[in-house]
UniProtKB/Swiss-Prot annotation:
InterPro entries: MarR/SlyA-like, SarA/Rot_dom, Transc_reg_Sar_Rot_HTH, WH-like_DNA-bd_sf, WH_DNA-bd_sf. Pfam families: Staph_reg_Sar_Rot (PF22381). Keywords: Activator, Cytoplasm, DNA-binding, Repressor, Transcription, Transcription regulation, Virulence. It comes from the Bacteria. It is found in: Cytoplasm. It comes from Staphylococcus aureus (strain NCTC 8325 / PS 47). Induction: Repressed by SarA and agr, particularly in the post-exponential phase. Transcriptional regulator acting as an intermediary between major regulators sarA and agr and virulence genes. Represses alpha-hemolysin (hla) gene expression. Down-regulates agr RNAIII expression by repressing sarU, a positive activator of agr expression. Up-regulates sarS, which induces the expression of the cell wall-associated protein A (spa). Its main location: cytoplasm. This is HTH-type transcriptional regulator SarT. Residues 55-78 bind DNA. The gene is sarT. Belongs to the SarA family. One of its GO terms (molecular function) is DNA-binding transcription factor activity. One of its GO terms (cellular component) is cytoplasm.
C-alpha cells in the first residue's frame, strides 16, 4: 500500500474512532444518541423567532436516513426537548415546535456537552 493511501486510511480510522467515542459519551452522560445530538444542534443553529421547523428541512440538512431522524424526533419529543405536530395546511408535513424554555434548555445542554467533550 502506498504512503498516501496509508495516511488516508489512518485519518479515516481516527474519524471512525472519534465518532464511536462521541456516541458512547453522549449515551453515558446525557442519555442521547448521536442522531438526537444532531437534531438538537440543528435546532440551536437554526433557531428562529417562531420556534417552528419543518421535519423535511432537518432531514435534508443533516443528510442521514429519514427513519433515523423521525425516530430521533419522536424520542426527543418524549423527553420534552421539543413538540411535533402536523402542518394544518398540509397534513403530510410534520412541524417541530420548540418553546423559548425548550430552546434555552437545548442551548445549555449543548454548551455542557461541548465543555465536557474537550
Amino acid at each position: 500500500m502506498n504512503d498516501l493511501k496509508s495516511k488516508s486510511n489512518i485519518k479515516l480510522m481516527k474519524r471512525v474512532l472519534t465518532t464511536y467515542e462521541l456516541r458512547k459519551y453522549l449515551k453515558k452522560y446525557f442519555c442521547l444518541t448521536l442522531d438526537n445530538y444532531l437534531v438538537l444542534a440543528y435546532l440551536d443553529v437554526f433557531k428562529n423567532d417562531e420556534g417552528k421547523y419543518f421535519m423535511r428541512d432537518i432531514i435534508s440538512y443533516i443528510g442521514i436516513d429519514q427513519s433515523r431522524i423521525v425516530k430521533s424526533v419522536k424520542d426527543l419529543s418524549k423527553k420534552g426537548y421539543l413538540n411535533k405536530c402536523r402542518d394544518p395546511h398540509d397534513s403530510r408535513n410534520v412541524i417541530i415546535v420548540v418553546s423559548v424554555k425548550q430552546h434555552n434548555y437545548i442551548k445549555n445542554l449543548l454548551s455542557e456537552i461541548n465543555i465536557n467533550e474537550t
